[in-house]
Amino acid sequence: MIELKGLHKSYITGNNKLHVLKGLDMFIGKGELVSIMGSSGSGKSTLLNVLGILDSYDQGHYKLDNTLMSNLSEKKAAQYRNNMLGFVFQSFNLISFKNAMENVALPLYYQGVSRKQRNNFAMEYLDRMGLKDWADHMPNEMSGGQKQRVAIARAMISKPKVILADEPTGALDSQTSLEVMDLFGEINATGITVIIVTHEKDISEKTNRIINIKDGIIDSEFISKN
């Protein structure tokens, strides 16, 4: 599903060149549940941006579902993101002036789905998350756990092949974090590849494979006992 070979990524800051990813190799198969760990500055956030087609890379190759992600126009990159990927963030990234249903339906708006259809689908996914009764509520009326469930429903509604989650439990208490990880497990059980970036060991242990990144390369990886 995801193949990286010799991936390099650098940033220019003033007169300095910051080499973040240094020839990284990685393979994640279809239907895997994987966590990516690393300290601040290890390159894990940059890696997630490349995987999410939010940033380019300098050298090497990145294949998503056997398609090379290279030299993409903004329009083409957006098409791949909308059709292949779902995103979940630590800060939820919900639109404050839209209710839960409207937030969940948003990806379908960009795909040209009619309002009636996308709202029906949004209600279906909110129901799956146990939030059907919260459809008309605004983000500021919901708890952190509820907001993250809305964000997960939004990521799922376009039926992506891969979910990319960046510190999805970072703003949640321990019990809610475990509930969210159980949701990711259920999503993964349907055949969707789930990749979670985290610095929390107990969260990584809820995935099937843990990849540790250090100084822009994979330092180690192992199968979780989960």
What are these regions (language model features)?
Residues 210-222:
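H-loop (His-switch) and adjacent beta-strand-loop-beta switch element
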Residues 2-213:
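ABC family nucleotide-binding domain
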Residues 225-226:
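ABC ATPase nucleotide-binding domains
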